[in-house]
Structure formats: C-alpha cells, structure tokens
C-alpha cells in the first residue's frame, strides 16, 4: 500500500513539474547557509555586475519532543515555513528514502532529502521579489532530533538549480501568482499542496491536505505535523527553536577591474561580501544566467539543456546604434561567460570569474538558441541615436536605471540601484561628440531657432501700396501702424508718420492709398500690416504727429479728386509740413470728398465766434476746382455747422495777394493758439523720443521753430507767398485752407 501511494504521488507530481537544471559541478559546496545571488543586470562594456543577494544564516535548532497520539501507525509530513510572503510550501520530494520505523522505537530517524541530478531542491525567488526568504523543506518521520535545516544549502555534493515555476506558463501568464518549486511540489498563490505519506505498514492512507497560507515568524518557527490515519486526522503541533543569525536581501555592484563591491541596498555588516572569496564564486560558479527579462521562471517542461532562468542584462554602448547584444553561454561544469561575438579575448579566469576587458564592443544580437548541450541565451537591447530619442530601453516592470560614469576604463556604479529589474545604462561621452545620455529619458524635443523677438512684418495678399504711406514710419513700443482694407488715401497719408507712445495712426477702410505702403522696419513687439485690397494714393498725410490720447483719422468714402476735403479744424499757417492735432481735437476728412493733389484734411481749432463774415464770401460762388496744386479751397464756415453736415462744392478762387475781410481777427487768435500747441507738442516729442531711443523728429528744429515762433513779428505774407520755405513740396502737407495769400 505504501509503495503504491508513493508511486501515485510521483506520477501526480511528474505531470505538473518541469525538469529543473542542476548547478554546474564547480558551483556545489561553495556557499554556506542560504546564498542566492541573482544577477540583476550587468554592463559588459564597462565591466560591472549588479546582484541581488538573498542570505539567511541559521544556527542549530533544537526540537522539542513530540507527543504521539493514540494509534499504531501514523505518517507525518513536516513543513517548515520561515518566509515573509506566500508562495512557499512544504512537500515530499522525489528521491527521498524513508527508514522503516518500529512502532515501539522511542526515536525515529530524521532525514534531509538530497536532490538528485535534474531535480530542484532550493528555492529561487522571482525577479523583483525582494522580501522573501525561501527555505528548503525536509521530510521528518516521527520525533526526535531533526538535524539542521539549511536554507538552500548544498547537501552531499548535489543540489538543484533554484527554479521558480508558475503553473500558467513559461513567463508567469497563468493564475499561479508567486508559485515556487519546493521539494517537487508546486504551490499556487496561498494554497499549498502537501503530499502525505504513511510510515507504518497497517492501513496507512495518504491524501493531500491543503494548508491556507500558514506562515511562521522570524526567530521561532512553527512546524505543522499532520497525521493521517484510516479513522481520523490528528494534528500535533510541536515547537522548535530556530535562531536566525542574519537574513535579508541586499543588492550590490561588483566591478571586476578594480575588484570592488559597492553595496547599493542593505548594510555591509549584514551582507558579509568580500571580493576575494564569495563574489567571484558567485559570478563564476553560482546560479547566474543572462537572458530575457519579464519572467522569473524558466520554461515549464523544457529540457535540461535549454531550461535557463532568465534575468536582466542591459548593455548600452554609446554612439553605436547597432552594437547592443549580450550572449551568455551556460556551460555544464564550467562558469558563465559573457562572450560578445567576434571577440575571443573575453573568457573565464582561473577561479571562475568572468573577465571582461574594457573597450570591447558588442555585435548584432541573435535570437534564442540551444546548441550542443549548452544553453545559450542572447538578449538584445536596441539603441536609437541621432533621431531625437535618448535614454535606455527599459526591460521589465521595475526598470530602475543605474548610471555609470567611466574614467580611464574604470567604472564606479552609483548608489541609486534598488529593487526590481535593474536595467543599467552608462552615461559616457560619445565618440561623435559631447553627448551624454541620461537613463530613462523619453523623447527629447528639438528646440528650433527663433527669429527676432516677437517681431513680425507682414504684407498680406493683393497689396499695391502707395509711395510713403507707411514707408519710413517709426512706431514706438506698444503701438501698431495699420493700413486697413480698401484704403485709398492721397499721397503721404501715413508716410513718415511719427506716432508717440499710447497712440495709433489709422487709415480706415474704403480709402485708396498710394504705392509703398509698407517699406519700413517695425520695432520690437509691433506689426506693420498692409491688409488686402489696398490701393493707396500717394502722399495723403506726411509726418502726422498725434498727441497723447488723440488720433489722426481719415474718414472713408472719399469721392473724386476734384473736391477738396473739408476739415473740421485746420492748423495755423507755416506748419512746416507737419500736421498737428491739438489737444481734444481730431483731424477728420468726412465722406463725400477727396482731396486734390496736395490738399490734406488737417486739424485746426474751431474758429473764433467773433467771425461774423458772410459765408458766401468765404465759400465763393464757383464749385469747379481747377487742377492747380496751388489752389487752396476750403469750406471754412463748415466748421460752424454740425459735424455731419455737407455743403455742396464750397471752393473759392483765392488769388495771391487777396485778403478776405473779417479774417484778420480770426487769423491772429488762431496763430496764437497754434503756437502754444506747437510748442507743447514739440517739447513732448523730444522728450518721448529722447527716452525711447527711437530717434528724433524727422524735421530739423529750425523748420519747427521759425515758422511757429511766437515772437516773430513778420507777417505771414512772406511765408505763404513763398514756395521755397519749410520743405513744402508736392509730396508733403501743404494744407492751409485759406490759400497762399498774405494776411
């Protein structure tokens, strides 16, 4: 009966479990206690390795006497849990032998089952499992001295490769959770399957008993003994004192070139690692394989030659986009060698440590392959360079980059390595420039070159600008000079305009402007925009000076050039070609009239109420305006009417030397007022342009001062009778609406 049940258990377990790979022969007998060294990552070019070191040093444990319940025979299954996480389980391993026990024997024999070749005995956590200590369970019959339980210790020269197996698939895709291989039993999540076995010869029955997640504590462990009989199940719990010397999980980086070990997680006092003994042994002889990430498990059901536990290796050669492959070959009875293709200089040292010379380069990757009894695993990491993407290609769920800086072929690993799958990258200068790649960066955006700061000069479609409309315009900061659509001004409307701060010179729609609307340089933060369908007419306004909070505006709907513009206010004579809009007034050219060449809508103060002359005298009786540019027609009395009123044709032939009656008093008062305003505006302009640095007025000071001088005693005959004075040419403002007569 006993042999039958034992064979049944073996058959059941054989259908579930894979065949593990045994350690190389040189790896046996080198590690005291539990030493599980997991290769977290390496950089073969720069010569450093990153390991996860799981250790647990145990002292001898004393077992108390177990009371036996009534019954002639009982089978015991002993499981010892000493872990922090679920996923460990006791189980009866294949290859175990039991010593028959006499029922009268006061003491049974304890036996620690050795593993046969090809069967896994020790525990191996998954990659990224950083808080677990995985013991190897032992089968104990009866009571008495159980001996020492060594976690992962190599016993009798034979041990199994630490192997984790998820029932769902080779990469842990199933529902297994944290299933691990313990003594030939597979655990899935919190459910532990325990194989039971009878020790007697009379009526022993055997059945698996599930145990829901019983876990012991560090220090004193609890062991469960389950007795299975024909009649009942009797559980007897015994206490055993287990003193754990040290246990924990550390991470360290080992640099073979300098023979140095850097602890990146943990403490030096707990780790007990020296580069002379254990580290080299771990590198050369322990369970270190290099393979593809994203799994803590080997392929279930794989052969012993190709079943390799993959871990993480990331190789980052700088400046070589295609040189990114590491091929590690696990030789039976030999050490693990990282051998780039085409570089035979990489080999094994005498003590089993891998020698990787500096300056070596890696060739193109190759897929997984298994040749001639050797398990060859190749893991490739692609590197993109020169295409706006930098950093590393992280492998696995917990990619925590380590940065490596080399100086003269010697490297020093940083202390930022923590748990998880560590993909290492080296930040070294490239061969093609001072390019330093930091780990974990995503796409790097390209910063394009910007033009002049916040400046735009835009000439839009279908623009036929007039000569000097906006050309040569100097616009101070915070202002915009705009010639809007369907503008047809006369020559020089906006040309040469000087606009002080806080003002805007605007020529509104439906006024046709003349050529050269835009040919000017815009200062910072301004635009000069000549918009669509602009056909300007030359020289409508020249050098308009708009005072604070005022605008010089030309109204739309200008009619034929034969009619003069009717200004609301007109300046005093001898303006020197400069239209001055006094305070509180606006210069407007009303609809229904377009100025003749040289006739400009100008701003002037309202006439004095003392003027009582006949309108017919001022207006005249002729509505036909000759095409002489020197004819000065004006509807002066229009200013006395309401703003929107129009007077049909209001031009008189004003010949030279003719004086209108009643204009003397009005002329005197207007001149005095204009002189005052001109002085104020001139001082204001000089102050504004002196502070802003844009430049002074376009006209020299003499042009402004002489005609407008308050103490000038000469009459206006000389000024208005002469054509050579104050730069009055065809392209400039001529506009005094009372003609060129002496006063």
Swiss-Prot record:
Sequence ranges of Basic and acidic residues compositional bias: 549-558
Keyword Cytoplasm (UniProt): no
Regions of compositional bias (Gly residues) in chain numbering: 169-179
Modification(s) after translation: Asn-62 is fully glycosylated, whereas only less than 10% of Asn-293 seem to be glycosylated.
Chief localization: secreted
Protein keywords: Disulfide bond, Extracellular matrix, Glycoprotein, Secreted, Signal
GO annotation, cellular component aspect: extracellular matrix; extracellular region; extracellular space; secretory granule
Polar residues: compositionally biased ranges: 129-141, 421-431
Coiled coil: none
Residues annotated as signal peptide: 1-18
Low complexity composition bias: residue spans: 402-420
MF terms in GO: extracellular matrix protein binding
Residues covered by region (Disordered): 68-225, 333-356, 385-454, 505-534, 549-577, 628-649, 692-743
Domain of life: Eukaryota
Disulfide feature: 31-42
Tissues of expression: In the eggshell, expressed mainly in the palisade and mammillary layers. Expression also detected in the hypertrophic zone of the epiphyseal growth plate, and in cortical and medullary bone (at protein level). Highly expressed in uterus. Not detected in the proximal oviduct, liver, magnum, duodenum and kidney.
Localization (cell): Secreted, Extracellular space, Extracellular matrix
GO biological process, one term: biomineral tissue development
Glycosylation sites: 62, 293
Keyword Transit peptide: no
Role: Major component of the eggshell matrix. May play an important role in the regulation of calcite growth during eggshell calcification. May also regulate the mineralization process in developing and growing bones.
Family membership: Belongs to the osteoregulin family.
Protein's recorded name: Ovocleidin-116
UniProt source species: Gallus gallus
